Regions:
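Short, charge-rich, low-complexity interaction segments located
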Residues: 39, 61-68, 102-105
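Residue-level signal for well-ordered alpha-helical positions
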Residues: 31, 60, 107-110
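Arg/Lys-rich, positively charged N-terminal/basic patches that mediate binding to nucleic acids
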Residues: 2-47, 120
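Basic/aromatic recognition patch in beta-strand/loop cores that engages polyanionic ligands
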Residues: 5-8, 52, 56-93, 97
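Enriched for short, Lys/Arg-rich terminal
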Residues: 3-13, 44, 82, 86-120
Length: 120
């Protein structure tokens, strides 16, 4: 069709607002420090992988399966961690970043107790 235009079929990805709770920031810093003491430079790579997981959930909030009540989880690429979050209205709230070997009951307790803390 000469001179015509074709509509793009590409999907536009819209990011949802994001809140990262203090506990999640602490979890990421603590894990990054642990990795850095074992192999310099690894902390930055860990943080980039966590950031990629968070970017995914801001674009696709329902990407992670429900784990406990309102809490969902996406796995961090290349590291044995999960980002635990909830969707509150249109906002993605990251509550914690926990190692996959951690006791699921302990994670649930931490997530449930954290919901009463003020947001960062």
């Amino acid at each position: 069709m000469a001179g015509g235009s074709r509509a793009s079929s590409a999907r536009i990805s819209v990011s949802h607002p994001l809140i990262i709770r203090r506990r999640a920031e602490h979890d990421m810093a603590e894990a990054g420090l642990w990795y850095e003491t074992r192999r310099p430079g690894t902390a930055l790579y860990f943080i980039r992988c966590v950031d990629a997981a968070i970017a995914l959930i801001t674009r696709h909030p329902e990407a992670g399966p429900v784990q406990f009540g309102p809490f969902r989880r996406v796995l961090v690429s290349r590291f044995p961690f999960g980002v635990f979050y909830s969707i509150e209205a249109e906002t993605v709230v990251v509550h914690g970043i926990y190692h996959s070997s951690r006791d699921p009951d302990k994670i649930r307790q931490l997530l449930e107790s954290e919901t009463d803390e003020p947001m960062a």
